[in-house]
Amino acid sequence: MKRYDLIIVGAGPAGLSAAIEAAGKGPTVVVFDENEKPGGQLFKQIHKFFGSREHRAKIRGYVIGKQLLEEADAAGVKVVLNATVIGLYQDKEVVVKIGDGIRHYKGDSIIIATGAAENMVTFPGWTLPGVIGAGAAQTMLNLHGILPGEKILMLGSGNVGLVVSFQLMQCGCEVVALVDAAPRVGGYGVHASKVARCGVPFYLSHTIVEAEGDDCVKGVTIAEVDEKFRFIPGTEKHFDVDTICMAVGLSPMSQLLKMAGCRMEDNPKRGGQVPVCDEYGRTSLPGVFVAGDVSGIEEASSAMIE
């Protein structure tokens, strides 16, 4: 069984930053990631980061990703891609599926930096082709150069929904409406203003009634909701669209931690079920730490700091 001083699961901003920091102090470090490319969400993000200079403000996400990869390579970090960690055990052992093979590794310490997954809202027709998450839209646009659709309705007015709406329009898509069940916009005013100036109508206190179509999305009906988020009869509005894009938050990908018996807690402010950990990311499992969105939903800059 191969042994490393430090095993990191996830080559996103948190995992790579942790690997760079650790490798600079001498330990042997390996990072496993299930994707073909490292960098996590960073390479989907073409917008500039906010914050201070030490948080890489005014630098585009994909540029930050390239910087982290260069720093990791220079530090001697071993990054193994197309490697899915399918098991985590209390004796600091991980089981990794690489190709058709299963391999076991042990570490003196393990950092789980698996990030988060997109939430979805269910409604009649939500499983039709053409209903996608905002992260999927970013992947199609910014990684593969593919338009997710021509006429798009965006559900969610947080920063992700606003930024992705603007990126879709920059690429030639028509965003027919931006819808949110909340009574006010959830994202930064600067992002909302950019979308509004493009003529996109905002429907606040509204949500989706149903997606329409047989084999794929052909249209969508929305309606106003009351303070208890119940549909108000007679307020329905129809849009002809081929894509419904959802930006309704993220949930930590904590499955490995649960598998190993890590103590968890429900914390809606941090995205749902998260591991109980201290300020250093120490979990209830000896030698197992967490960093990034798996410990609570934050920005990529926060993940790198952790």
For each feature predicted by the language model, list its residue ranges.
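Residues forming the flavin
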Residues: 1-306
